[in-house]
Amino acid sequence: MGTALKLTQTLVLRDPDNAGHAARVTELALRLAAAMDVSPSRVKAIKAGGQLHDIGKLELDRAILDKPGALDPDELEEIRTHPELGARMLHGIRSLRAALNCVLHHHERWDGGGYPYGLGGEAIPLEARILAVADAYDAMTSLRPYRGARTREEALAEVERCAGSQFDPRIARVFLSL
């Protein structure tokens, strides 16, 4: 995992707030994977994917990432490129191949309304579906430049509300039981 650590450190240097986010997402996703009795190979992918899921943001304009208000359509489109940018960054690194699907698909939605490919249901790799719940929960409970943090209860209610649309309903149920 030396390469993953170096890439994570690079991201942290550019975006210190992301350090805590990546660590929290990884921890939540690993707890969720353990509760679901996920195989060791998938756990390894989730660990690396959690650390690196936003690595593509290294390629984005810092002003967009730090913008305090709503993003305009062009800025939103640029943000939505980060999964593919991250996957391209990892593509040639053999030791991080397991993380590739997590990085590429963590913004796909159970109902097919996500990005970058609009995958839905079981077409989304399990590791990415697990990370999606952990990532969204941490995003909701963290202070962002454009909004305040939600309470734990508010975020859990949102995960429950989005089960079957944004999130795999089985994974959401397990997450809510943690």
Model-derived regions: residue spans:
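Metal-dependent catalytic cores of enzymes that make or break cyclic nucleotides
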Residues: 4-178
